[in-house]
């Protein structure tokens, strides 16, 4: 961590939050589809492709949040030396500092970690069938976005879904190829974005009987 320097003012956090939410929507609308197209060269089944991307999102957020936690500890230890306010103001100063110095995050390490984790996932095709490096661009964008979302108060996160759960219309949209009378989620296409337990952006699922 660098020597103490003035953090970015938090008054811009509302616009920063809006930009991060917009970025999440953009990744869903464009870069997710590009990743699907890249995977379809190796995997014919659309369901498998969508499962791969969903797990990539979940693993990217998990890896980025873990990396953020480690960076935050180091930054807090350093800023505490010269900080003159209370614990709450130190917390804000730490978040502002990390938001201002994004290069503290080694995103390449997270991308590698996510790819390795996916290669070991028993629900996905084995590494010999498809190399998940083909969607490393998507993984990188998700990791960077997830890391930045942790600098908000409260942070933004994704809701982790489970196959077979009851369909929640407040949290998900049904995919176009769903059985619209089915009450259960067959699999998840895209996770919902949440803030302090409240759904900010709905996810997408496939429902089948």
Q: What role is predicted for each listed range?
A:
Residues 1-209:
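Extended, amphipathic alpha-helical stalk segments that mediate dimerization
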């Amino acid at each position: 961590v660098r020597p103490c320097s003035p953090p970015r003012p938090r008054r811009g956090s509302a616009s920063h939050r809006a930009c991060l939410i917009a970025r999440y929507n953009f990744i869903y609308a464009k870069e997710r589809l590009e990743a699907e197209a890249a995977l379809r060269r190796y995997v014919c089944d659309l369901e498998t492709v969508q499962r791969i991307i969903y797990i990539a999102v979940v693993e990217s957020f998990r890896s980025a949040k873990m990396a953020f936690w480690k960076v935050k500890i180091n930054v807090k230890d350093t800023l505490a030396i010269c900080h003159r306010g209370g614990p709450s103001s130190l917390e804000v100063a730490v978040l502002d500092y990390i938001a201002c110095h994004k290069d503290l995050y080694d995103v390449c390490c997270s991308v590698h970690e996510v790819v390795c984790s996916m290669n070991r996932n028993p629900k996905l095709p084995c590494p010999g069938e498809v190399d998940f490096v083909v969607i490393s661009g998507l993984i990188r964008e998700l990791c960077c976005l997830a890391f930045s979302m942790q600098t908000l108060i409260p942070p933004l996160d994704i809701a982790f879904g489970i196959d077979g759960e009851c369909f929640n219309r407040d949290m998900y949209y049904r995919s176009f190829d769903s059985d619209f009378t089915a009450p259960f989620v067959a699999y998840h296409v895209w996770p919902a974005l949440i803030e302090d337990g409240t759904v900010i952006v709905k996810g997408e699922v496939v429902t089948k009987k």
